[in-house]
Amino acid sequence: MKSVITISASLAISLMLCCTAQANDHKILGVIAMPRNETNDLALKLPVCRIVKRIQLSADHGDLQLSGASIYFKATRSASQTLNIPSEIKEEQTTDWININSDNDNKRCVSKITFSGHTVNSSDMATLKIIGDD
């Protein structure tokens, strides 16, 4: 009888964890090492085109100063959008969600995201983590 209760409890916990994981549609799209000098050609190319409707940026291992970002969509006309991003992100800080202009179904297939910026207040290169939400 005790083993039946243990198995039932284990299944219930597994089911709760499974449903929680499915409810979270956030994916780490990639990480970019930010150089110490201003650079305007930092690109995150997605190997598989991802449907994304908004992104978050997070700084790890140092502070970041950003001067621009663009997102490129997989389309015959190479559609792109300039993103409105914060100029500074402190270490361990995550931005609010940044919405991506989208087509009628409120989603687009993202192929590349580019950034301009650099590491500040750190001897090591900071990293910029890009999180997507579909």
Curated annotation (Swiss-Prot):
NCBIfam families per record: PRK10154.1 (NF007541)
InterPro entries annotated for this entry?
UPF0412_YaaI
Checking Pfam families in the record gives:
DUF2541 (PF10807)
Keywords, ordered alphabetically: Signal
Q: Where is the secretion signal located? A: 1-23
What is the name listed in the Swiss-Prot or TrEMBL entry for this protein?
UPF0412 protein YaaI
Where on the tree of life does the source sit, at the highest rank?
Bacteria
Q: Which family does it belong to?
A: Belongs to the UPF0412 family.
